[in-house]
Amino acid sequence: MSPAPDAAPAPASISLFDLSADAPVFQGLSLVSHAPGEALARAPRTSCSGSGERESPERKLLQGPMDISEKLFCSTCDQTFQNHQEQREHYKLDWHRFNLKQRLKDKPLLSALDFEKQSSTGDLSSISGSEDSDSASEEDLQTLDRERATFEKLSRPPGFYPHRVLFQNAQGQFLYAYRCVLGPHQDPPEEAELLLQNLQSRGPRDCVVLMAAAGHFAGAIFQGREVVTHKTFHRYTVRAKRGTAQGLRDARGGPSHSAGANLRRYNEATLYKDVRDLLAGPSWAKALEEAGTILLRAPRSGRSLFFGGKGAPLQRGDPRLWDIPLATRRPTFQELQRVLHKLTTLHVYEEDPREAVRLHSPQTHWKTVREERKKPTEEEIRKICRDEKEALGQNEESPKQGSGSEGEDGFQVELELVELTVGTLDLCESEVLPKRRRRKRNKKEKSRDQEAGAHRTLLQQTQEEEPSTQSSQAVAAPLGPLLDEAKAPGQPELWNALLAACRAGDVGVLKLQLAPSPADPRVLSLLSAPLGSGGFTLLHAAAAAGRGSVVRLLLEAGADPTVQDSRARPPYTVAADKSTRNEFRRFMEKNPDAYDYNKAQVPGPLTPEMEARQATRKREQKAARRQREEQQQRQQEQEEREREEQRRFAALSDREKRALAAERRLAAQLGAPTSPIPDSAIVNTRRCWSCGASLQGLTPFHYLDFSFCSTRCLQDHRRQAGRPSS
């Protein structure tokens, strides 16, 4: 990869106010046209195709006979290109987009020179096609801004600045100056002599800068760089965090009548009056009349401060009026000074800035030109298709011909169908060590899952050892013989017996295998021997299967719990459940110095006292849970009885309720037991007369002899009884 090109050299900046008329940079000045080779300079004509005028001779020469041209060409702008990069850059130009819009509107197209002059002078009204340039209506102002936003984009070719003018002096230096400080607008084509004179006069002598945006106004009168007078206004006209002026908001939809909206409307009117009164004053009016340059920055919705209406301070067709071609901040006096300083700065280059920017552009790539492959013609394509069809036909006939020659040569091809099962358990880590599920399951489900997980884990280790060409029968073969051949040659029977017992949890078979020869070195070596490339031992297999009794027996027989598999996991970490892990902890409590339990990752011993405390804690938790459930059940039953009593009391008539209440009062006065209540369901008669809710612990609402739990029930009862609530 070639190194990145160096950045374009930075120009020297000099203020026009700091130069004298006989400064060296002004000696031998001349107006520079666009450099040859750029897209915008290759059109020495005044119209383009589609404009209804005669085509240029250059285009006729380019067109030639009616054949398919191999040149890169833009038919809209009548331009040719050397490579695709130049063509793509041309399609991004505002000039090309403008000509496309003009062609769609059946309007005359502009050449590169005309378009550059129109855009550099800011005379975009002619570009937009407006005929009435003297109209000062708000609709025309909106059209002007819309066209300006469309055609003044920053997607221009390298070194092309539409608002600047390029000069060259006798020393070979190139000077860039902003067009807006070189005198008023001129009808195209502009006279180079006037531009040179204005440049040598060191910028505008009398200049007025006006800016307005978002309730802010700033204006200043300059003589050179000296400030004659300045004024700023600020009114609250834009709602915070919305960014839209109140007047523009009202124009889009129904006006708001809030206090804030009314305040913003009042401030807009006040700001309009203040600015108009300021610019109509004697000092400002005289300055606007005598100024050689007027610089303006205002949004489309805020231009009514300066244009339109009675006594407008500015006229749209004024040749001294220029839009500020810079990005500006909030209108303040400091911003006015910054804008004037920026516009009156002269940039001096030692070489052509257009060519330098183009060469140093990251879009410029230097490539070796290779001869392109010649594209096949239609006749060649048809011939290729015929050859392919003939070849396919021969291939279809070849089996028939081959059947006859089979007997002669005595050669037969036998095809064998092989079924291959591809396992993907090695890609899933959870198959080796299942995740702990939060949902509680019964012991039968747990035992089945543990057994299946152990079989899947051991089967995965077997599949990792097998080559990819084995059939499904080899995959389904018993695990023992394969492990015997790999790890325990010479004693497969003992190995198979131990492995099968560990899988199934058969403690009796293990005792028979280990009891006759507890000190046999062969058995001791097999207890901690790895199972295949996975490095699983018998202790790993028993722990993964959740066989706690087998784990205890293997540990007592001498199995090493510190042996790790190929993934550096000891048997304790692959245990399927807590009971299996507890066997390691019990063995650690009985044999604290037998192994390095830190390496085995056993957290600590499990003593009988600890197990007793855990059992007691579980019993207490179980009893508390049972008591809590019984209490909740009693509470639910009580609430259900209360709801039933409430429904039955509310269903009684007023006469039955009065009789029941009188009976209760009489029984309370006499101290005698009350008679059974009908249906024996209404236990508490002190209830709301309307809804039947209990009044125990409440302060009831009364009227007459009735009691209610709320005013709503009281009003409902009165309405039902036909009595007014007042």
UniProtKB/Swiss-Prot annotation:
Coiled coil region boundaries: 609-659
EC assignment: 3.1.-.-
Gene3D superfamilies according to UniProt: Ankyrin repeat-containing domain (1.25.40.20)
List of residues that carry Phosphothreonine: T607
Bias type Low complexity, positions: 120-130, 457-473
Positions of ANK repeats: 493-526, 534-563
A family per Pfam: bVLRF1
Compositionally biased intervals (Basic residues): 436-445
Annotated segments matching region Disordered: 40-61, 120-141, 387-409, 436-474, 588-656
Residues where Phosphoserine is found: S258, S361, S398, S533, S675, S680
Zinc finger (C2H2-type): 72-96
Chief place where the protein resides: cytoplasm
InterPro entries named in the record: Ankyrin_rpt (IPR002110), Ankyrin_rpt-contain_sf (IPR036770), ANKZ1/VMS1 (IPR047139), VATC (IPR041540), VLRF1/Vms1 (IPR041175), Znf_C2H2_type (IPR013087)
Broad EC category: hydrolase
Domain of life: Eukaryota
Subunit structure: Interacts (via VIM motif) with VCP.
Domain comment quoted from the record: The VLRF1 domain mediates binding to the 60S ribosomal subunit.
Family statement drawn from the similarity comment of this UniProt entry: Belongs to the ANKZF1/VMS1 family.
Protein name: tRNA endonuclease ANKZF1
Species of provenance: Homo sapiens (Human)
Lineage, broadest ranks: Eukaryota, Metazoa, Chordata, Craniata, Vertebrata
Gene: ANKZF1
